[in-house]
């Protein structure tokens, strides 16, 4: 991929309008009308499903006994390696980590990026991290978007970009880990972003910064969306299931169009969307 191919994609992202940090209420779709910005919630690691997940895969030993960042990365590597990525696979009925790992082994198959990010999200929640799976969307959806994770580091007091499909995280030129909002902003401002050396697809194809960040993710960072409730079995449909509400962070002058049953809210306020999970 030449820079010539990436330029129009980066240009679209760079031409997006900015955010509005003074906005105090979201744009509401469906019947979910509210005058206040809704709260993000994170499932407690003592939830019985998360406790079972932690024990089932012995996540404590997978995370290891190093510092917080090493645990975050070890869980990323584990999900990247435990199932293959297959972007064309049909989504399983039961969308939780235990069920999906078993299904992939049994049927010798993979899952798509959305399922991989939900698995990593459950593992982070089970290990006591605040985490979300984030759908990264292009300005115009033609055939592809991408789903990754934002996990909150207490030691760095910020959200971090973790992508289980590509075993990927991003730093600045000094090696400081970056979050999704920071990567987007740096791409918009032509500031340096660095992809980890071992970023890859299915342990076969090495990923480059030029393709993965300047082209693929520049395309997919026009707006981002996630459920307000970060939980186990987030998108498994079962009797009595309360479907999560989704919120999109969109640039001013743009609308996600509140897809029925999915996006309930749009916000232009990035400091709200990326607020600390410990913020009162």
Where are the model-predicted features located?
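Short His-Asn-centered micro-motif
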Residues: 109-113, 134-136
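Short, small-residue-biased leader/transition segments that mark boundaries at the very start
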Residues: 1-7
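Low-complexity, Gly/Ser/Thr/Pro-rich intrinsically disordered linker/tail segments
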Residues: 189-280
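Secondary-structure boundary elements
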Residues: 17-111
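A structural signal for well-ordered alpha-helical segments within the folded catalytic domains
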Residues: 73, 111-122
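Hydrophobic/aromatic-rich core segments of domains that either
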Residues: 118-190
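N-terminal targeting leaders that direct proteins to extracytoplasmic destinations
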Residues: 8-16
